[in-house]
From Swiss-Prot:
Family: Belongs to the universal ribosomal protein uS4 family.
Lineage: Archaea, Thermoproteota, Thermoprotei, Thermoproteales, Thermoproteaceae
Species whose genome carries this gene: Pyrobaculum arsenaticum (strain DSM 13514 / JCM 11321 / PZ6)
A Pfam family it matches: S4
Coiled-coil ranges per UniProt: none
Domain of life, source organism: Archaea
InterPro entries: Ribosomal_uS4, Ribosomal_uS4_arc, Ribosomal_uS4_CS, Ribosomal_uS4_euk/arc, Ribosomal_uS4_N, S4_RNA-bd, S4_RNA-bd_sf
Entry protein name: Small ribosomal subunit protein uS4
Function noted in UniProt: One of the primary rRNA binding proteins, it binds directly to 16S rRNA where it nucleates assembly of the body of the 30S subunit. With S5 and S12 plays an important role in translational accuracy.
């Protein structure tokens, strides 16, 4: 993280090198509309998280089988509990094929919309920010909250 006086931005790993690439701009705009993101920083944060996951999977693949054995299963279980993969027994190659949509699908805003609690993805964001969504009875006001698999069923609408 660096020194306390010079904190580093969390999204720098996900920020593109060439910001004005037309293809990338169109792709980002499409993702922002589909997932109701407020700005590109939210997308870059998701990309940074994905980059961390793929980097870790790549480092595990480069290890020998004996070195990899004690580290691989906890990593896969962590991804499964977070909801990024469907089965904790998937091969590491499958983890490398994850894209940013896997991360964006776990955001509270997206899950509230997919559950049918909101009419649109933007309505879901407004419900969350205004404090009308609770997880296990606790109000969550951050639309970017990554919902773990175990809490997905405990999302409720609070009036």
């Amino acid at each position: 993280m660096g020194g306390l006086r010079k904190p580093k931005k969390k999204y720098l790993a996900g920020k593109p090198k060439k910001i004005w690439n037309k293809q990338l701009l169109l792709e980002e705009l499409q993702l922002m509309g589909e997932y109701g993101l407020r700005n590109k920083r939210e997308l870059w944060l998701a990309r940074a998280r994905l980059k961390w996951i793929t980097r870790r999977a790549r480092s595990l693949l480069s290890m020998t089988a004996e070195e990899r054995a004690p580290l691989e299963m906890p990593f896969k279980e962590k991804l499964y509990k977070a909801g990024f993969i469907e089965d904790p027994n998937v091969p590491l190659d499958r983890i490398l094929s994850l894209d940013v949509r896997a991360i964006l699908e776990r955001r509270l805003q997206t899950i509230v919309y997919r559950m049918g609690l909101a009419k649109s993805i933007y309505h879901a964001r407004q419900l969350i920010v205004h404090g009308h969504i609770a997880i296990e009875g606790r109000r969550v006001t951050s639309p970017g909250f990554l919902v773990p698999r175990e809490l997905e069923d405990k999302i409720t609408l609070v009036q």
